[in-house]
Amino acid sequence: MATLLSAQRAGWRDYLELTKPKVVVLMLITSLVGMFLATRAGVPWSVLLFGNLGIALCAGGAAAVNHVLDRRIDALMARTHKRPLAEGRVAPLPALLFALALALLGMALLLMFTNALTAWLTLASLLGYAVLYTGFLKRATPQNIVIGGLAGAAPPLLGWVAVSGHVSAEPLLLVLIIFAWTPPHFWALAIHRKEEYAKADIPMLPVTHGERYTKLHILLYTLILLAVTLLPYAIHMSGPLYLVCALALGLRFLQWAWVLYRGSRPHAAIGTFKYSIGYLFALFIALLVDHYLLLNL
């Protein structure tokens, strides 16, 4: 009866929240960039529209599964305690059915309007995030973000393959950029929310190894990220405009990581986290602008 009443109280905004729309939007930006970088011609409108819609639906389905599996953890954390399942506005079964419907519709669109490889890579990414990361790694190891980050790094590869139909070095390099970006991004948030993660018994790196150790690894990963972001220029995938942007954005990220490591600002952790979001958006936009600038030279 409680489950039924919960489902009756749920509105469309609750189900939209299950999909983590802000996260999906950032994923779609990287997917779009992957599509446009894959071709010197225009991207077919059907691939552009339905390919990204399919990727978004699958990502939303994975996010909904994350809400279901993390509902007890979410209820213990200030950042997440008002999520639909944590507050009981949506019951687990309707949320799972919603996730399944999104995933099936997304897969159908990808199979119809892109290609089978894109669909299966998207499915692998969905399962990697929803099952491997959320269901196991998140609760099992402080390296959860490092290992599980591969699933979240897939969108530019999915966009590229949706257009080209095959995997090549360039989209894998885009995946590598997001893969290297993920640890400093999430560990900065984990430092800011350390007590909440400890209360929820989630073995995030600041909880298991302390803040100083985590800050050092944020700094090291930011250095790795800076080096990785220079590779598109090194392999002639991008030009001088991207190089300048990558250096400027990366050095600013490194400055944030250094300030965090030195402990000279009280809110450096959340500042680093927020900067990392804008950083990734700006970096991929720079890749896109540089791509079309090179085509017109």
Swiss-Prot record:
UniProt xrefs under InterPro entries: Protohaem_IX_farnesylTrfase, UbiA_prenyltransferase, UbiA_prenylTrfase_CS, UbiA_sf
Record has Hydrolase as a keyword: no
Catalytic function, reaction form: heme b + (2E,6E)-farnesyl diphosphate + H2O = Fe(II)-heme o + diphosphate
Highest taxon in the source lineage: Bacteria
Regions that span the bilayer: 23-43, 45-65, 93-113, 117-137, 145-165, 171-191, 216-236, 241-261, 277-297
Record-listed E.C. numbers: 2.5.1.141
Top-level class of the enzyme under EC nomenclature: transferase
Mode of membrane association: Multi-pass membrane protein
Main location: membrane
GO molecular function list: protoheme IX farnesyltransferase activity
Pathway note: Porphyrin-containing compound metabolism; heme O biosynthesis; heme O from protoheme: step 1/1
GO biological process: heme O biosynthetic process
Cellular component, GO annotation: plasma membrane
Keywords: Cell inner membrane, Cell membrane, Heme biosynthesis, Membrane, Transferase, Transmembrane, Transmembrane helix
Record-linked CDD domains: PT_UbiA_Cox10
Key word Phosphoprotein present: no
Intracellular or extracellular location(s): Cell inner membrane
Any Pfam family: UbiA
Family classification: Belongs to the UbiA prenyltransferase family. Protoheme IX farnesyltransferase subfamily.
Protein function: Converts heme B (protoheme IX) to heme O by substitution of the vinyl group on carbon 2 of heme B porphyrin ring with a hydroxyethyl farnesyl side group.
Note: Carbon 2 of the heme B porphyrin ring is defined according to the Fischer nomenclature.
HAMAP family: CyoE_CtaB
Protein name from the UniProt record: Protoheme IX farnesyltransferase 1
Organism: Pseudomonas putida (strain W619)
